[in-house]
Each structure stands twice: as structure tokens, then as C-alpha cells.
Amino acid sequence: MLLTSLVLALAQAAAPAPEASPLPDLTLEQASALRCSVAFGLVHQAQRAGDGSASDYPVMAQRGQEFFVRTTARLMDETGADRETVMALVMREHAALGETPGRVDDVMPACLLMLDASGL
């Protein structure tokens, strides 16, 4: 719940402003970590909603949330982007994952490897 609430609250705070910052280009590593962070949030949301397909994955509440927090903090550090800009990146990735049915399931195997490699 906390991860979902965090994403929604930050997304609302990142609503486009008239003078919104351009989104930074991300490295492959940064883009992959962001994609996985969002995928973990979507899986966590589905798990909380009782969606049976999400039960195929480990519980995302704690580890997924920590991965999301660390990834967004690292993006701010590495790109110099502010919170609003990073949350715009999150929302863009959320839209990209949501526009193709099954996309989250496609990325989760690699994301779970990334999560394990992170040591969380």
C-alpha cells in the first residue's frame, strides 16, 4: 500500500506545470532500473487487490518498495533531476508498461534478477 500511495502521491505532485523540465535521457541501466521499479509497484498493487496472476511473483511490498526508493533517489543524484522530473519519468514508464497487455509479465523475470542482484 505504501509503494502504491507513494507512486500516486508523487505522480500527483509531478503534474505537468507550464514550465516543466524536459525529461533527461537515461542510460540503459537507469532505464532498466526505472522500468523494474514501476513493474514492482504494479505487481504490488495487483497483489494487494488479490489479483491471482500477481501471486506468481514474490511479495513486492518491502523489497519492491525499497528498490523503487533507491532507484528514484539514484536517478535524482545521477541526472540532477528534481522529484517532479523523476516522477514524470515514473509516469511515462507506467504508461508504457500499461499500454501493452502482458508487458509487466514480460519484464518481471529480468526485473527479479535485478532485484536479487541488488541485495535487497
Report the location of each language-model feature.
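Short N-proximal segments of mature Sec-exported proteins
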Residues: 22-78
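Sec-dependent N-terminal signal peptides
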Residues: 2-12
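Short linear motifs at secondary-structure transitions and domain/linker junctions
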Residues: 16, 42, 85-87
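Compact alpha-helical subdomains of small soluble proteins
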Residues: 56-120
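Cleaved targeting-peptide boundary
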Residues: 10-25
